[in-house]
From Swiss-Prot:
<dbReference type="Pfam" id="PF03477">
    <property type="entry name" value="ATP-cone"/>
</dbReference>
<keyword id="KW-0804">Transcription</keyword>
<dbReference type="GO" id="GO:0008270">
    <property type="term" value="F:zinc ion binding"/>
</dbReference>
<keyword id="KW-0067">ATP-binding</keyword>
<dbReference type="Pfam" id="PF22811">
    <property type="entry name" value="Zn_ribbon_NrdR"/>
</dbReference>
<protein>
    <recommendedName>
        <fullName>Transcriptional repressor NrdR</fullName>
    </recommendedName>
</protein>
<comment type="similarity">
    <text>Belongs to the NrdR family.</text>
</comment>
<dbReference type="GO" id="GO:0003677">
    <property type="term" value="F:DNA binding"/>
</dbReference>
<keyword id="KW-0479">Metal-binding</keyword>
<dbReference type="InterPro" id="IPR005144">
    <property type="entry name" value="ATP-cone_dom"/>
</dbReference>
<dbReference type="GO" id="GO:0005524">
    <property type="term" value="F:ATP binding"/>
</dbReference>
<dbReference type="InterPro" id="IPR003796">
    <property type="entry name" value="RNR_NrdR-like"/>
</dbReference>
<comment type="function">
    <text>Negatively regulates transcription of bacterial ribonucleotide reductase nrd genes and operons by binding to NrdR-boxes.</text>
</comment>
<feature type="zinc finger region">
    <location>
        <begin position="3"/>
        <end position="34"/>
    </location>
</feature>
<keyword id="KW-0862">Zinc</keyword>
<keyword id="KW-0805">Transcription regulation</keyword>
<keyword id="KW-0547">Nucleotide-binding</keyword>
Length: 149
């Protein structure tokens, strides 16, 4: 690794530690030439699968779109940002674990509902009503009845 101070190519690692729940390595380095010290972080480059929409079009996975949908569903509900971020992390891990290069948007929506039903039932109904395009009150009633079982 090049020294950020003198651009020398020879540096040595003084200390290595796992950070971010073991997903990154923090390394303390020292330049052999100028003896300045600096820190680097290493992490795996994780590629998310592409999303196949219902109309057949394909687009890159958009974490912000996923986060926005969840935030709208839990708006004014007693759900913390930590809970939201944990759910998003689990959804992304599940998608990566499929090993597929492409996943259907339907799978993402179902994963979102699986997590919302455990976080907050009202948020689940909100999301499901939009995602499943409820057209009348009876569809809301059916969804609520399933939750009460």
């Amino acid at each position: 690794m090049h020294c950020p101070f003198c651009s020398a190519t020879d540096t040595k690692v003084i200390d290595s530690r796992l950070v971010a729940d073991g997903h990154q390595v923090r390394r303390r380095r020292e330049c052999v030439q100028c003896h300045e010290r600096f820190t680097t972080f290493e992490g795996a480059e994780l590629v998310m699968p592409r999303v196949v929409k219902q109309d057949g079009s394909r687009q890159p996975f958009d974490e912000e779109k996923l986060r926005g949908g969840m935030l709208r569903a839990v708006e004014k509900r007693p759900v913390s940002m930590d809970q939201i971020e944990q759910a998003l992390t689990k959804i992304k891990s599940t998608l990566r674990a499929t090993g597929e290069r492409e996943v259907k948007s339907e799978m993402i929506g179902n994963l979102m509902m699986d997590h919302l039903v455990n976080l907050d039932k009202v948020a689940y109904i909100r999301f499901a009503s939009v995602y499943r395009a409820f057209e009348d009150v009876s569809e809301f009633g059916d969804a609520i009845a399933k939750l009460q079982k």
